[in-house]
């Protein structure tokens, strides 16, 4: 995909319009493969109660978001509105104190001071004026994948019934994305409801699942 142009490791900004200078030469800007994955599973018990949880961790990997690629250009996400560093609406014309100041340097290495226009679909963050790398995110995450709370009936009750063990459990899955870097969506989301990795378009919000379980042993 397309990348930024760099000077001494800093992203270059066009001083005439405040936008990124795009390096149009196709190059590798990400890798869908994570550096590693891990899980933490633990169970805490007290008398007849047991609380177990599973935390999933992924470190590394990248995902390209077509949702922000087009979304930033259409002005849907929150970061395309609000106030800029001058306290003025981002979407006001630059001549009236609006616009956004992108982090980077001029081609000569001096600090960028030119604000980029955000008043139309042709803004500095959307598909027309930002490189693919701007919409490529770190796919790392930490998730509370599952929590289970179980209660085992005491023997004094079970002895009156034709069972050797009875337990009831409440289960929750995908309860909390503790940490992530991909904006507006689950890092594991793919193309719509599909499971394509490393590419998001029309990503459907992740859902929390709740269940109830009864276990009977004879």
Where would I find each of the regions flagged by the language model?
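Outer-membrane beta-barrel domain signature, especially the mid-to-C-terminal portions
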Residues: 10, 14-35, 66-70, 109, ...
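Membrane-embedded beta-strand positions in outer-membrane beta-barrel channels/transporters
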Residues: 39-41, 146-150, 211-213
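Membrane-embedded beta-strand positions of outer-membrane beta-barrel proteins
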Residues: 53, 168-170, 214
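Extracytoplasmic gating/loop element in the C-terminal half of outer-membrane beta-barrel translocons
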Residues: 60-162, 167
């Amino acid at each position: 995909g397309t990348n930024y142009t760099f000077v001494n490791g800093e992203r270059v900004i066009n001083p005439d319009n405040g936008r990124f200078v795009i390096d149009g030469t196709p190059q590798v800007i990400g890798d869908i493969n994570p550096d590693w994955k891990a899980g933490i599973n633990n169970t805490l018990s007290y008398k007849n109660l047991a609380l177990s949880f599973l935390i999933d961790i992924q470190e590394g990997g990248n995902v390209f978001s077509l949702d922000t690629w087009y979304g930033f250009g259409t002005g849907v996400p929150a970061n395309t509105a609000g106030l800029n560093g001058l306290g003025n609406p981002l979407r006001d014309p630059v001549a009236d104190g609006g616009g956004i100041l992108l982090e980077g340097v001029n081609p000569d290495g001096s600090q960028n001071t030119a604000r980029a226009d955000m008043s139309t679909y042709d803004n500095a963050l959307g598909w027309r004026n930002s490189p693919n790398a701007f919409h490529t995110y770190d796919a790392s995450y930490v998730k509370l994948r599952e929590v289970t709370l179980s209660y085992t009936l005491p023997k004094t009750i079970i002895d009156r019934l034709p069972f050797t063990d009875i337990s009831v459990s409440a289960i929750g899955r995908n309860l909390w994305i503790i940490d992530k870097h991909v904006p507006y969506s689950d890092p594991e989301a793919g193309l719509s409801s599909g499971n394509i990795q490393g590419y998001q378009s029309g990503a459907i919000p992740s859902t929390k699942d709740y269940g109830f379980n009864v276990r009977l042993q004879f």
